[in-house]
Amino acid sequence: MDIRKRISIVLVALLALVGVSAQAQTVSGMLIDGQHKQPLGYAVVQLLGSDSTYVSGTTSDDTGRFALAAPRDGRYILKVSFVGMRTLCHDVVVAGGKDKEVGALTLQADEHVLREVTIAAQAPKVVLKNDTFQYNASAYRVAEGSTVEALVKVLPGAEVGDDGSIKINGKEVKKILVDGKEFMTGDTKTAMKNLPASIIDKVKAYDQKSDLARVTGIDDGEEQTVLDFGMKQGMNKGFFSNINLSVGNHGRYSERGMAAYFKDNFRMMGFLSANNVGDMMFGGGRRGGFGQTRQGLNNTKMAGINMNYDNGKTWQWDGSLRWNHNNGDLQAKVFSDNFLASQHAYTRRISQQYTRSNSWDGRFRLEWTPDSMWNVMFRPSLQLSKSDGLDVSTSATFSEDPYAQGDAPLAEDLLATMQAQGTLVNRQRNTTVTYGDNTSAQASLQVNRKLSANGRNVTLRLQGNYNDADAKTFSTQDLQYYQLLDAMGQDSIYRAYRYNLMPTKSHGIGVEATYSEPIARRTYLQLAYQYNYALSKSDRSTYDFSSLGGGYFDGVEPAYRSWGSYLALLQQPLGSYFDQSLSRYSEYKTHTQNIQLMIRMNQEKWRFNAGVQLQPQHSIYQQDYLGVHVDTVRNSFDWSPTIDFRYKFSPQSNLRLFYRGSATQPTMSQLLDITDNTDPQNVSVGNPGLRPAFTHRIHAFYNGYRQRYTQSWMTFFHFASVHNAIGNSVTYDASSGARVVRPVNINGNWNLNAGVMFNTSIDTLGVWNVNTFTTVDLNRYASLLQQSRQSLVERNITNQTNLSERLTFSYRNSWLEVVLDGSVEYNHTKNQLQSAQNLNTWRFAYGGSINLTAPWGTSLSTDLHMNSRRGYNDASLNSNELLWNAQVAQSFLRGKPLTISLQLYDILHQQSNLSRVVNAMGRTDTEYNSINSYALLTISYRFNLFGGKPQHPAGVRRGDDGPMMGPPGGRPPMGPPGGRPPMGHPGVRPF
């Protein structure tokens, strides 16, 4: 057949297909919660025939919207059901081949459920609706003026890390929503540290579907865990604000303001804050756990605005803009025990680091749905940042435990003693001044077209990114060896004084097309193709002043961007110190294709996704470094299988099983057979024989809920094993303390993480409650160690076991909450080559908290916890710390909008800051500086204007059921210490 005829036939067939699909009819509408007058998401919506036979079904989205397919004209029954609501049946007539919009449908609460709630008197702490954990904020009391971070910390199954990361039921939270709307996308900290807990009614934790799954209606398994904060009834109309001013001793302060405006379909929130206390809530940490490690002193400022608009029909948009400023003052005392084949290597380091940064981040999302068949989504973003850093450190390496000689290993007398004993390997001092300027932009456009009402659709996605970075670094390194002699028989000395200019640019574009075809009832075949192109260029210029002699720059006081002071001492033009071999130019191009084939089965009780992704890649790498020119091409082929199964036993009980395999290619720099000895203490060597690593990931999750006893439970299991993991082979030189690191393929790396959570009321009124959360973490790290180039390579295995249990008992009524809690964490580390370095450490925490509210507006919050450590080599770390924090607050004026409070932190002056990290290469204990004990006097004022009239509702405390529950917004109570006032160009203080 002639090729033109074939093309004509295909075009005619496609036009016919589009013509037929254009006749498809859709029944759509919106669901409303009749009690709270809010959109009702996750309700089950079914379209039944006139004889009640099933036709199609779906669930309402976060905004309460739904859309179902009606295959032909006729009479239908629209059935809507939701836990705790009366089932609604609505007659629908579809005629003339046109879509049917049924408008807003209101569901009323089930009277039987209402009677149960009335009898209970106290709202259940947590309920489960479909796949959503819904926490009632009124059931968790936090101190006056708290932000939602304090609220999240006391939720069952929640963890807030030292870096501000959030985990719910073992899954990391990637996004924050407010009333189902995007909020400060890409930044969870802004919401956590600025949203007042007093305005929150419910906190939902669930997996939000991807943009593609949401518009196609076909679950693609690419969801991300979100926290959705639901505001109290009546607070999403009009204007309200919270202003908080705090001042304390030791120069502590915390100021924060928040304002929100809601009108019709538009909402806007603005934030301002400045503090040097970290805003990390109660110093004793979460209930039943340990406080967060305070890493230095920090002075932060923030301004942000978030806007949302939804006309309920065709247009939605979300936008956010934020500015962040940070000044940091971090002093770290680090002790490392490095796992070597048959010999010890200990390192003690003290560093003083100053940092400051300014950043802007703007993000926008525009969604246009002109009709039931088309959806267009556009997401642009822009980030600007500048940063400065100053780091001065002193360190020494030993062949024997230096603490056997004394508690200050870097003291001159102890260093002299260990030098005489032959256990001092090296000693060094480093100074580094850094600057960075970065601009980046991203954009994506997604267009979806439904070709029929039964799931046939096509999606086109375009994306691009651009990055322009400029960095400068001036560094000095003075290193003295005590077991390595020079030609004169003296201790060897190495020095490196260098100035680096490092411009970097990169950009990328991508295009993706996805087609979904229904092949059976609720079964779809999905084919996706994606092409990405990326280009990255880096051109580092290095100027080497090492030949000028030791101490040449000792007269310069280190400060931000002070390289001018260093360069002014040069006797020759800067260009004469240019070092071609140390300079590095690289250019990296990649052409990546992703081909994915998936089968998706979305049944009423279960969902099953299975498929495979193929990824051929073509890479071109050019580099000029250390006198070696590289121009190489690599072609690789990766594949990734996926299986995802979900079963819904009931609306309150769900099971999910997930498997994914993925390949990881070694980087080009790892493959190049080049020895990089620019840092003699850390020499890297490439390995052309590296193979790609393949990771197997298995996840399981099960949850359930029993409404009668307000019982909820959850268990999860995560396992990952890596075949041909890209690890390191380390050769240690005992005479210098230097390491030669070469990437190698290692088998035997895996990790397992599992947990169980159970929450229940003891009595029928829900006054007495118990929560338990148990976790198990098992990690196995493999590495290769070599004592010298002539010795044998030995395989080292480090096994780490971490067990933890948190138990909480609580009593609460309308004016009092009493909590007793405790936790225990056991960590066992076993090293194969050095059994003497096996570790068994324990951490205990136990105590309680009280929140009391008097009718006349006085409130008292206090917590008392004993934190204990055992099993650390440094005896000073095996401590008992009794942490006591307290706050007293008094509200004034009609409606209690004005509150004055006094917060006392670490009253007994016993809190310390310590972190431990264990991996295949060793263990590291770090102690940080901080101001833990201080007091703050806070004035908070809340203003509300709804419907054009100012309102100051009764100042009822969190836990009552008034329309404006909770304390006035304010500063997060009991925050840990932060930083100093803004620093200019700090000098370096002696240790």
Which residues fall in each region the model found?
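Short, surface-exposed beta-strand/beta-hairpin micro-motifs centered on an aromatic residue
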Residues: D61-A70, S165, A191
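Structural motif
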Residues: M30-L40
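A short, solvent-exposed loop/turn motif at the edges and junctions
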Residues: L48-Y54, R75-H90
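Primarily recognizes Gram-negative and organellar outer-membrane beta-barrels
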Residues: G186, K209-G251, N265-F991
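Short, acidic, small-residue-rich periplasmic hinge/interaction motif at the N-terminus
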Residues: I32, Q46-L48, S81-M85, A95, ...
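Periplasmic plug
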Residues: L128, S165-A213, V226-M231, F266
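Short, acidic Ser/Thr/Gly-rich low-complexity loop/linker segments typical of extracellular
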Residues: S50-R65
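Short, polar/charged loop or turn motifs at beta-strand boundaries
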Residues: T132-V154, K167-I168, V178-F183, N244-N249, ...
